[in-house]
Amino acid sequence: WHVAEESIHHRDEDTRSNFLNAIGNILGDSRFILRYLLKDAGAEMGYRIYTGSGLVIPGSSVLTSDPFFLNGELLKEHRHFSLSSGAYKAIVETQMFLKRNVNPVFLGGFIVIDYPIKESKYGYLPPIATSVSLSASIMRYDELMSSIDIGLMMSHSSQGKWNGLPEPNSESLMLSPSIGYLFNTRFGAVALNLQKPYMIFGAFVQNEGDIDQRSDVWQISFALRFLSKRE
């Protein structure tokens, strides 16, 4: 590591504590979004289209200096992670869904863009984050009125900057196909979903120093929606 310590990275720590280049906290960013319904077919067949915009307000858990020492400073102990970038961001989003009477009965998707307004007060300009999602629902018309849901999400992050210098490992592209199963019960609807992210390029694709390492991520989610009781 070019310093006297055994490691300048590996410590038992979390975001609650302060460090040499970090302010600790348990709170990350706050997101405020206003949405406008452009078109709504209601219970009939047709389109439902939303548009929205908002603001990301940075949290208190931030890095206070460049953890990559891009200006050529002497390497010293530092932290790379925080819950917030420390920068304000604008949010723009659009959602469009189509309800049909043939399979797939639901088709749709959304696009969300988080665009940094300016650098944080510590000189960090976060990447532009873009998420695009497409989904479809196929009804099975069985006793449970179940459906099979398939989807694909693309997440892209542009290159961030510290004090005007490109941040390593910040640019990335990830594709996440998913499949789910939704069925109805006496008390409500139950949904199970399985998602497999694939990093196309970015920090988890590169392997510096030919290290014997890999990452393999699966995401499983469970949702339960209760029916309200009516007199």
Which residues does each predicted region cover?
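Residue-level signature of outer-membrane beta-barrel architecture
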Residues: 1, 36-38, 55, 94-100, ...
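Transmembrane beta-barrel domains of Gram-negative outer membranes and organellar outer membranes
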Residues: 1-49, 57, 76-81, 131, ...
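Outer-membrane beta-barrel and related beta-rich outer-membrane complex signature
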Residues: 7-11, 46, 61-67, 121-123, ...
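Surface-exposed cleft-lining segments at the edges of enzyme active sites
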Residues: 74-85, 117-123
